[in-house]
Amino acid sequence: VLYVVENGETVNSVEDLKGKTIVTTGKGTTPEYVLRYILTENGVDPDNDVTLDFYSEATEALSKVQAGEATIAMLPQPFVTSALSQVEGLRVALDMNEEWEKVAGSKLVTGVLVARKDAVEADPARFAAFMDGYKASVEAANTDLENTAALCEQYGIVAKAALAQKALPNCNIVFETGDEMKTDLETYFNVLYAADPTSVGGQLPADDFYYAG
């Protein structure tokens, strides 16, 4: 769900970020680790070749772009869609999900479902039914945009349904289980561990961390 937006036409590749200032959020969390990894893998030193300007909230980073105080930002959805509608000349320069896949060979993970092992084992049939419903929900989110957007507004996920409906196709909402899920998560955890072992509790998770189904 991460994208680099630019008010201009100078950034068409990760390498084009050299010498630029990027406003973003998430220092010490996923956005920073993802950005640093993608920059490094493309030959851009995140400590010397670019300036990373972090803010605590995406709204703060967006306000810098809106005020003309920054021209490049890395933002998540739905802030990207909101920004594109509010800032004349702003465009999506890089899809960081695609850039991650190019260098990592797996999908970028930004959200997961977790469950207590004892609860799953106590009633596997009930958990399987829940997973079927969860899968159907993901499919609905990607195909029934109008109703999904209405729910986003109803439950306070996004302020306006119209904004949610525009943003949903670019939110990369997927349902992964089994080996595919494990592969993507292991790649992601390895990147986090290399950046800061404490970000994953000091060690990589064992095989029993993952639900095989």
Task: Report each predicted region and the residues it spans.
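Well-formed, non-transmembrane alpha-helical positions, independent of function
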Residues: 16, 63-64, 82, 167, ...
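Pocket-lining segment of extracytoplasmic ligand-binding domains
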Residues: 57-152
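Residues that flank catalytic or metal-binding motifs in active/ligand-binding sites
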Residues: 18, 109-111, 188, 205
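Short, glycine-/small- and polar/acidic-enriched structural segments
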Residues: 1-44, 53, 71, 77, ...
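Secondary-structure end/capping motifs
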Residues: 120-195
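A local structural motif
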Residues: 40-56, 60, 64, 69-71, ...
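Conserved C-terminal helix/tail region of periplasmic/extracytoplasmic solute-binding proteins
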Residues: 186-213
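Extracytoplasmic/periplasmic, Sec-exported soluble proteins
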Residues: 9, 14, 23-31, 53, ...
